[in-house]
Amino acid sequence: MKKLTKISTALLIAGLGFSFAASAKVTVFAAASMTDALQQVAKDYAKQNPKNEVVFSFASSSTLAKQVEEGAPADIFVSASNKWMKYLSEKDLTVKETEKVLVGNDLVLIAPAKSAVNSVDIAKGEWINALKDSYLSVGDPAHVPAGQYAEEALTKLNLWDKVKDRLARGKDVRGALALVERAEAPYGIVYSTDAKVSQQVKTVAVFPADSHKPVVYPVSIVKGHDNADSRDFLKYLESDAAKKVLVGYGFSAK
């Protein structure tokens, strides 16, 4: 399982010279594209709930969903697509009354920050020529939501057949981002929020909204983990304060 990223109260307030022992812990399995935003939300939550602790496991939604299916101790699941939430829901592994869409996102084409290209007409497909002997960096369309959205969009634009054999397939969307950050790929397809948090890439095009299903992030409490602490953090996730943070990171409010 992915190493859990811990947001601990002691670390958050160490600068003030004192700490509290956590009396409750909520484990959140969340799509990799939400890493920065959810960590900030958890920090803000900890300020209001100093005796609570939130820990994260960030990875591809498909990887996390299958870990939940295998019994991983997740209290809350945040997916980057309806597909993987539905996957767990149909297996009766979610608390259905808590299922809802948290935020949305956009799909974008990125290039290294130092690239001479600043914008492209995504529909014309001339940008594909710049790949030359290199690859287009994407989350693996076989299981990564960002890659599946990318395949859908490129198919709609009649470009998929031109690039399907020239893909660098990341294990998640942050893996796809990393290749472009290191300039190991001239272009990549990620979410707008991923591009926004990186100074090593720039957005050169936004895929038309009608070229793919809406990018949404459903959230739910995992069955067997419906308790007061899980409910409390989920309620905070849906609060105006949390939504403000998420929107600040580039997500769209729902």
UniProtKB/Swiss-Prot annotation:
By its UniProt entry, which InterPro entries does this protein fall under?
A: ModA, ModA/WtpA
User: Which residues belong to the signal peptide in this entry?
Assistant: 1-24
Q: Which CDD domains match?
A: PBP2_EcModA
The record ties this protein, via SUPFAM superfamilies, to:
Periplasmic binding protein-like II
Describe the family membership recorded for this protein in Swiss-Prot or TrEMBL: Belongs to the bacterial solute-binding protein ModA family.
**Function noted in UniProt:** Involved in the transport of molybdenum into the cell.
Q: What is this protein called?
A: Molybdate-binding protein ModA
Instruction: Specify the species.
Output: Haemophilus influenzae (strain ATCC 51907 / DSM 11121 / KW20 / Rd)
Name the encoding gene, please: modA
